[in-house]
């Protein structure tokens, strides 16, 4: 048995092996974080060793909480584990649900708590090569244009967040400023 995450089985929240949850398409909890500095968003390219969506661009970090872990604790933990980021305390923005085929017989059927972390000042980022192969800061408008032009380069959930939940995640200031 691998990592246990919170998933719904017969309308009950129970601990389920993470791989099993994806193979069976079980609805499960997830956490996504966006780090924003001025008008730029930190995105990551997933490591090639990931069991689904390897090599695709995603938001700053995304994961599943451990069975007994709160979403906010999970967000801080995964910023540290995936990107070596400490000292950021993401604020809760939104809960959303989505369902997406992520290839290799895997399905994301997630109830996601989304967090936004405002970066003020220098930020040391040290990607974990088992998780992340590349990072970059990109403006909101530029990210939308890239997703439109090369959708195959981005994870399904990032496209869903940008196309259907951006106002709630980022707020009007980032979106309006990015359009100007």
Swiss-Prot record:
Mg(2+) binds at residues 62, 82. It comes from the Bacteria. SUPFAM superfamilies: Nudix. The active site is at 62, 110. Mn(2+) binds at residues 22, 28, 64, 108, 110. Its cofactor is Mg(2+); Mn(2+). GO terms for biological process: dimethylallyl diphosphate biosynthetic process; isopentenyl diphosphate biosynthetic process. It catalyses: isopentenyl diphosphate = dimethylallyl diphosphate. Pathway: Isoprenoid biosynthesis; dimethylallyl diphosphate biosynthesis; dimethylallyl diphosphate from isopentenyl diphosphate: step 1/1. Binds 1 Mg(2+) ion per subunit. The magnesium ion binds only when substrate is bound. Residues 26-160 form the Nudix hydrolase domain. One of its GO terms (cellular component) is cytoplasm. It is found in: Cytoplasm. Its EC number is 5.3.3.2. One of its GO terms (molecular function) is metal ion binding. Keywords: Cytoplasm, Isomerase, Isoprene biosynthesis, Magnesium, Manganese, Metal-binding. Catalyzes the 1,3-allylic rearrangement of the homoallylic substrate isopentenyl (IPP) to its highly electrophilic allylic isomer, dimethylallyl diphosphate (DMAPP). Belongs to the IPP isomerase type 1 family. This is Isopentenyl-diphosphate Delta-isomerase. It comes from Ruegeria pomeroyi (strain ATCC 700808 / DSM 15171 / DSS-3) (Silicibacter pomeroyi).
């Amino acid at each position: 048995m691998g990592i246990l995450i919170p998933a719904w089985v017969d309308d009950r929240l129970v601990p389920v092996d993470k791989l099993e949850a994806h193979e069976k398409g079980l609805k499960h909890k997830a956490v996504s974080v966006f780090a924003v500095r001025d008008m730029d968003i930190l995105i990551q390219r997933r490591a090639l060793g990931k069991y689904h969506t390897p090599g695709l661009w995603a938001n700053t970090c995304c994961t599943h909480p451990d069975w007994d872990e709160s979403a906010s604790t999970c967000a801080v933990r995964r910023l540290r584990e995936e990107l070596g980021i400490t000292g950021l305390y993401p604020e809760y923005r939104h809960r959303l649900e989505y369902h997406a085929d992520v290839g290799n017989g895997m399905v994301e059927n997630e109830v996601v708590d989304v967090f936004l972390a405002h970066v003020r000042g220098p930020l040391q980022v040290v990607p974990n090569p088992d998780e992340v192969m590349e990072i970059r800061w990109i403006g909101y408008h530029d990210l939308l244009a890239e997703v439109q032009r090369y959708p195959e380069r981005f994870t399904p959930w990032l496209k869903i967040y940008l196309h259907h939940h951006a106002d709630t995640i980022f707020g009007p200031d980032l979106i309006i400023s990015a359009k100007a």
